[in-house]
Amino acid sequence: MSDDDAPESLRGAADGPAWRNFYGRRSGKTLRPSQKVYLSEDLGRLRPEGITREENPERRPLDLGALFGGRPVWLEIGFGGGEHMVHMAARNPGIGLIGCEPFVNGVAMLLGKIRAAGVENLLVHPGDVRDLFDVLPEASVSKAFLNYPDPWPKKRHHRRRFVTQGYLGPLARVLAPGATFRVATDIPDYVRQTLEEVPQAGFDLVSESGEAWEDWLSTRYEQKALREGRVPHYMTFRRQG
């Protein structure tokens, strides 16, 4: 599916200022008819207004109290097919969870899972997480997840990884003091870079392990990694302050 075939609410959703490059795919396989229905019927009510530069050129902060009724706010960065995000929302009904994912097919998969699970404490930004960082109030998020991010394996592309200061600085700004940041990856060099870069952004390392968190839901990507002999690694950081 081309960008021109995407619903209006997705076209240009990740566009930021002219200097903000976006790397990675926005769409993949042709969407199933049911997925097109999810996008057309459900995305509009689950997508907060005021995140994109077109909707909010002044970059006014979001009113999270209005969006989530004063509940603690969690953030998932790049939710993939959405299984972990829906699992966390169902397990923690007293929180509000925002997920970011620029890949149209992943957004459609998440919307289907939301319908099936009946969870109501989720919102979706179908675009670049940096646009969301722009408008999240300072110290407003109490937990963030980064699960199996794009590894960008070529050395010349390592600067595109999320665990660089260009992403981690804005993340640190929106996380409250003491907030948790969890990272899961099966790429050894991504582990190395995460352990080097995240503390430089104002985080303390809490744990690193080959054993998953107690509330973890293994994703499709993780199962594929295990079948192919790769070893998952789980890291937990705490925002300083």
UniProtKB/Swiss-Prot annotation:
Coiled coil: none annotated. Substrate binds at K154, D186, T219, R220, Y221, E222. Keywords: Methyltransferase, S-adenosyl-L-methionine, Transferase, tRNA processing. It catalyses: guanosine(46) in tRNA + S-adenosyl-L-methionine = N(7)-methylguanosine(46) in tRNA + S-adenosyl-L-homocysteine. It comes from the Bacteria. The keyword Ribosomal protein does not apply. GO terms for molecular function: tRNA (guanine(46)-N7)-methyltransferase activity. This is tRNA (guanine-N(7)-)-methyltransferase. It comes from Cereibacter sphaeroides (strain ATCC 17023 / DSM 158 / JCM 6121 / CCUG 31486 / LMG 2827 / NBRC 12203 / NCIMB 8253 / ATH 2.4.1.).
